[in-house]
């Protein structure tokens, strides 16, 4: 609406009742996420119940104030790049579990938002590429993977690349478009087809100087 507002900390200005409910929610999420085995969240006692519930349906059942509901939905969109109705509550709790809790995930000082790379994070793959020299093949989408007792053969744009081992570092949904011989387990195929990427556009804006710091906004 053309107005600029500011706040301190990780939580925006909300009505008192919403803030109190958010505090209770955070404690509940911390308690419930600790019930998930870190390497096997599906083995939790209430995994079936939580996986059958979307984040949105859970919010409607358990969150009363409008401010706390809106904040919980915003968290889902910001962290998972998906709508609350598209993600199970078990997935949400597991995300918190792997990220060491909500405060760490959204926090700046001592949290996930604290650090950045001078010059940009793109330098990580760039430096890795320098070490690999001429062993990188670009613009070659993989069509098929063949596996035998001696290793794997990767087929990409008509070329065959041989290796002892293969690390498949692509989104699960893209992996489902690759032909495997021998075939992947049926449960793995089903999982790949049911794990789409989030839908989001990120924009990075660079300014000549950090004017917001001079105004005491950061």
Predicted regions and their residues:
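Central beta-strand plus flanking loop segment that forms part of the substrate or channel wall
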Residues: 187-215
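A short alpha-helix-loop-beta-strand transition element characteristic
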Residues: 1, 66-72, 212-218
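Dinucleotide-binding Rossmann-like beta1-alpha1 core, especially the glycine-rich loop
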Residues: 1-33
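Core beta-strand elements of the Rossmann-like FAD/NAD(P) dinucleotide-binding domain
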Residues: 156-165
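Flavin (primarily FAD) binding-site architecture
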Residues: 165-186, 204
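Active-site/ligand-binding neighborhood in enzyme catalytic cores
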Residues: 37-141, 148-151, 169, 177-179, ...
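Conserved flavin/dinucleotide-binding core of flavoenzymes
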Residues: 8-9, 151-153, 169, 198-200, ...
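Short acidic/polar mixed-charge low-complexity motifs
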Residues: 3, 150, 159-160
